[in-house]
């Protein structure tokens, strides 16, 4: 039995949502990657910012909703976000965090109990896992999942709209599709504006400043067939890169691939 | 004052819908091309088939809804289709018709009074004029309209699903767009399944059997910029080509660009 299946089974036995059970497991040090855990439930990117900078970051997200779709946020100093999960404690419920000081990642703790401050504001941003589930449910193949690697991501020449010290290029993720599949993927992801929504670009990677599709700036390269076109979505790495570039004295994010699992269901994010 | 503006003015004076007034004008021999006439109202492709073949053609349309979206049809021998227009008479209300015998176009009359038969069934199929209006309303440029020519159309290697003697390749129309515009065009036209709906292909024309984008099989070539990709929609020329290839003893279509103007509004065809 896989870890994922075991978590699911224990959740069923306890009568808890699989998402809630997963958070309890991470809280007590069990489990690791959130890939494939609590399928059907929304996973989120995490950004925890001191209140002094939170207003400008909040505006940055509002101004750049495709890379930074807010699905939940906390009051200052409050580690709970009831709208995203019963009993959710942002200090303990993510498998691994990254602590940033002056733009440098200085630590990767498994909880924030030693780092928590009364001025911290938590932002939870939508993640492509949700729309990938919808694409796969429609029968569309996701290349990096087939290949067992990370999605390729690229810095583009598309400038985000700046807010205060938060500024920088949009980072995009890429999934190759045959043309008819690409059209279907536009339709499906359009239904999910809370998790990056429709693609921002397709074909012609050089038009958005991608010189070599085989050399992603983040993640792993995947092959693009001669009968396929690359399709690009705004990516949740954008806010992480922007936070690092802003060189805040202090900030926290999740570690890549180790997300916050919420009690929201992916299907409930569909606008139609 | 243009003919179109004059028609609009006289319609307003008579208290008729502009679409109804346009049909009355065509009925009495006034006016010509339907391009730009009764803006906002649905124009349709026309196929008039003897009842003996109408069942198979109806199934062909049902099996191939993207090139052949039915927006109205008549009872056998009945020249009226009340759902498409008060007072509509299919024998007189289209500016020009094409009469086909054994797959050959033999006449282009301006009415069907001498050709009408009690066994004729009329099919009215959606037309790209409706979705082009929606694209332009969103600010997307339509190249062939900018260039003042006909949309380029191509026979593809996409086989329609056959029904009886009706069979053949899908014909597509092409409009070039920048990638972000192409994504928007997918979204907008998805809202209009009754007028061909979303594109069937984009980029990589050779994948659907188009050897030279600059040599359309119908219509006129238009330039495709190096920063653009060609976007392909199923086209209402498909059923006309299929009807000709079926070599029916007798059939009638509209003459290209001289459509049936209905009282339906384009906006009412939007499914969302």
From Swiss-Prot, chains A, B:
Gene3D superfamilies for the chain: PSTPO5379-like (3.40.1640.10), PSTPO5379-like domain (3.30.2040.10)
Enzyme class, broadest EC rank: lyase
Record-linked InterPro entries: D-Glu_cyclase, Putative_hydro-lyase, UPF0317
Entry EC number(s): 4.2.1.-
GO molecular function: lyase activity
Domain of life of the organism encoding this protein: Bacteria
Keywords, ordered alphabetically: Lyase
PANTHER family xref list: D-GLUTAMATE CYCLASE, MITOCHONDRIAL (PTHR32022:SF10)
Listed HAMAP family: Hydro_lyase
Family affiliation: Belongs to the D-glutamate cyclase family.
NCBIfam families: PRK05463.1
Protein name: Putative hydro-lyase BRADO2538
Organism expressing this protein natively: Bradyrhizobium sp. (strain ORS 278)
């Amino acid at each position: 039995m896989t870890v994922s299946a075991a978590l699911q089974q224990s959740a069923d036995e306890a009568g808890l949502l699989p998402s809630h059970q997963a958070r309890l497991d991470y809280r007590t040090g069990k489990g690791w990657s959130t890939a494939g855990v609590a399928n059907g439930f929304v996973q989120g990117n995490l950004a925890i910012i001191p209140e002094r900078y939170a207003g400008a970051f909040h505006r940055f997200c509002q101004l750049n909703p495709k890379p930074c779709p807010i699905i939940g946020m906390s009051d200052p100093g409050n580690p709970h976000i009831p709208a995203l999960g019963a009993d959710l404690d942002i200090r303990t419920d993510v498998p691994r965090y990254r602590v940033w000081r002056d733009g440098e990642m200085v630590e990767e703790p498994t909880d924030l109990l030693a780092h928590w401050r009364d001025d911290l504001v938590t932002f939870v941003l939508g993640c492509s896992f949700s729309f990938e589930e919808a694409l796969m449910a429609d029968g569309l193949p996701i290349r990096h999942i087939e290949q067992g690697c990370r999605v390729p991501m690229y810095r583009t020449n598309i400038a985000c709209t700046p807010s205060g010290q938060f500024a920088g290029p949009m980072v995009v993720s890429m999934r190759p599709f045959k043309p008819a599949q690409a059209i279907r993927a536009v339709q499906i992801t359009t239904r999910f504006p809370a998790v990056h929504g429709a693609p921002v670009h397709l074909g012609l990677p050089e038009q958005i400043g991608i010189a070599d599709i085989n050399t992603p700036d983040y993640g792993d390269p995947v092959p693009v067939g001669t009968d396929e076109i690359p399709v690009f979505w705004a990516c949740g790495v954008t806010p992480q890169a922007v936070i690092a570039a802003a060189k805040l004295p202090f900030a926290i994010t999740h570690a890549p691939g180790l997300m916050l699992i919420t009690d929201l269901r992916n299907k409930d994010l569909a606008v139609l």
